[in-house]
């Protein structure tokens, strides 16, 4: 008998699953020096946001102003807005792909499904996946494993404690807990994308599609094209009453029948404003909401998210509403969103490191829709914006733990302040905490040619809770750090306004302060999406030389990121930033529109 080829790899951190949580975990770990393997069972990255599923990215900022996720999340969203004005999903896939490939420390294993794991005691030694495209077994040894698979593939392979289903009220004392626990979950959906044309488009449904011939059968299901142009038909949801892992193929078949039946109803049964609409996409890979949830040292509950609890080991945050999809999904009847159990949250809540590592497997971490949370708390942490910041937190923590030769649990006890400072330095927002400022940047060294620059060193890099926390500076007016003696400057860090609420982004006809606009198919009479006009596009960094002259040490007129962090190598007694223009401008110099640049942080080290 022959054997298939096998390749052995040894890294510091192995990430299983390449959704946004896994992708960002891998990138974060690699950027902080860890050698990383990213094992993804699909041909593309992005998970539910990828071209295979096409769910929009929601998060805290989708429900509460000024809470849009930053860090790597905002980095890729801005890249997509800049390079993908028509919101083409293939380009979105490529942006995530290039973010991973840009990191030399990452070995990317696409089309590779994790199948086996080897353990020694309560630690994972290696995992092995099968790569379908190469018919090769890929074995990966690592110090730390981060399961971002969504379905928690490692849970059964390594006997990690996990939960499935809905808890009884008596378990956590939650308002939305059940009288008795069950194994039901939130369901999964197939997305539909369509666009409006300037002519009538016919549609012939497949024979196997369900038939919804009357409006009564579609009662309370929003399906009027012209009125619901933003919908992606997330409500075509089934599987919550089945096994959300092992029954996925059967659920997919049912979802296809429903999805094609819904489109047939809109096109051919009644007046729904759909005559000129053309079908672009119906997914074949269901977007899952819930399956297994790991048990960590701490299990988040409804009380935690509802009260906006902040934890001493907080490493991420959420703010999406409690959004519990009841198991019946599409099959349920009821007025409006009768299949949903919702409760708006007033404040963001913290996510502790203790909810991102396993209670009983020492070197197992996780991030995404499988963290240590009750079913009700999970209904808010599960959205992709929140998954993304959890992924960045887990990857950063893993790299730091490897650096110190400790477990994630030990890191949380001994190095949590260092981890939090690194995350905030990487532009991750942690409610209730302030970022540590460079010792070179003090009120005594900072001055501005115009206005008060003190907000640049207050340690909070966004508008929040009624405070602007930013400096409004005139273009072509400098912000300067002056030192008593010649000082070596190795880098600068700049955080500019990227319009987190998307209020000044052209092509956003509904002025949505959410990231749904990333993934909306454009109709024939809609312009392309634009870019945040308030963002600083052009600026210059100058240092004072020994002759008392200002010399340019960095300059760009193509910035399209909120965080700019670049290396310098200069010895000087003064260094200054000169904002030159925002995206309101048509030229390098800000000739019209905004005469001011809105900056949250400018520091040197």
Predicted features and spans:
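Conserved N-terminal/central alpha/beta ligand/cofactor-binding core
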Residues: 2, 10, 28-35, 40-123, ...
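Aromatic, loop-rich ligand-recognition surfaces of beta-strand-rich domains
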Residues: 462-605
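Beta1/beta-strand and adjacent pyrophosphate-binding region of the FAD-binding site
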Residues: 7-19
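N-terminal Rossmann-fold NAD(P) dinucleotide-binding loop
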Residues: 22
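Flavin (FAD/FMN)-binding glycine-rich loop and adjacent Rossmann-like elements that form
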Residues: 48, 111, 123-126, 133-442
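Short, mixed charged/polar active-site loops
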Residues: 8, 135-139, 550
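Predominantly extracellular/luminal regions of secreted and cell-surface proteins
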Residues: 437-460
